[in-house]
Amino acid sequence: MAGGREIKTKIKSVQNTRKVTRALEMVSASKIRKAQERMKTSRPYAQAMKQVIGHLAQASTDYQHPFLVEREQVKRVGYIVISSDRGLAGGLNNNLFRKMLGEVRPWQDKGAEIDVVTIGQKASAFFRRIKVNMVGSVTHLGDSPHIEQLVGVIKVMLDAFTEGKVDRVYLVYNRFVNTMTQKASFEQLLPLPAAEHKVAHHDWDYLYEPDAATVLEHVMTRYIESLVYQAVLENVASEHAARMVAMKAASDNANKMIGTLQLVYNKARQAAITQEISEIVSGAAAV
């Protein structure tokens, strides 16, 4: 019954794989709750910074920070792309890269050059493979990233924008909607869109020392860093959610495969037993 032994071996192999996918699913389910908590905790800071930027920008009417000024001609575009370090997350990273390449193409058609800063091993490997000009990279941030880990690569792009080497900067990441939905997001980071630094009312009561322009100079960089950090946290939550869903689907498929193989094994065993009985009956009749 060699066929039966082969089927049993395959069933055992699929069962072992199912143990791995179930374990990964449970680990991701545990991590996603912590990732959501970190994401929600950091949101108020980013929102408060956004409001302060709006107040400062309107208070300093005679000074325009470079991060707020739209440039007439865009010769070079920079992208900060956030991905996961690990795989087994369904199409999370590939969908993000596909969206980005679609957004990049119109700029390339206009003759603009492209610079990329990557956060995450998957993005780094992808853009090296397609030979895009990478000017900075950071990987292995872990499940609890800190903003200090990001300051270096963010500074690379901010300096390039300030020095006029890059005329526009975009932030590309997976936005966490819910456990089942993660959306590839593509947002303009620099210059800040007008809606980002305008507020509806002028009824704030702030005193700026030494003046609004000086405060704006210091706050603006912190604000950009907070936006990127928030995007990283969103991407981490998206990664765990996508992996949990992917591993559940893999476990379900393994269950179906085991059921199918078990049925095939039972049929093969039944056929072998029937054959043995037939041979015994035939032998007895001959005697």
Curated annotation (Swiss-Prot):
GO terms for biological process: proton motive force-driven ATP synthesis; proton motive force-driven plasma membrane ATP synthesis. Gene3D superfamilies: 3.40.1380.10, ATP synthase, gamma subunit, helix hairpin domain. It holds the Pfam family ATP-synt. Its main location: membrane. Keywords: ATP synthesis, Cell inner membrane, Cell membrane, CF(1), Hydrogen ion transport, Ion transport, Membrane, Transport. It is found in: Cell inner membrane. It is a peripheral membrane protein. PROSITE patterns: ATPASE_GAMMA. InterPro entries: ATP_synth_F1_ATPase_gsu, ATP_synth_F1_gsu, ATP_synth_F1_gsu_CS. One of its GO terms (cellular component) is proton-transporting ATP synthase complex. GO terms for molecular function: ATP binding; proton-transporting ATP synthase activity, rotational mechanism. Produces ATP from ADP in the presence of a proton gradient across the membrane. The gamma chain is believed to be important in regulating ATPase activity and the flow of protons through the CF(0) complex. F-type ATPases have 2 components, CF(1) - the catalytic core - and CF(0) - the membrane proton channel. CF(1) has five subunits: alpha(3), beta(3), gamma(1), delta(1), epsilon(1). CF(0) has three main subunits: a, b and c. Belongs to the ATPase gamma chain family. This is ATP synthase gamma chain. It comes from Xanthomonas campestris pv. campestris (strain ATCC 33913 / DSM 3586 / NCPPB 528 / LMG 568 / P 25). The lineage of its organism: Bacteria, Pseudomonadati, Pseudomonadota, Gammaproteobacteria, Lysobacterales.
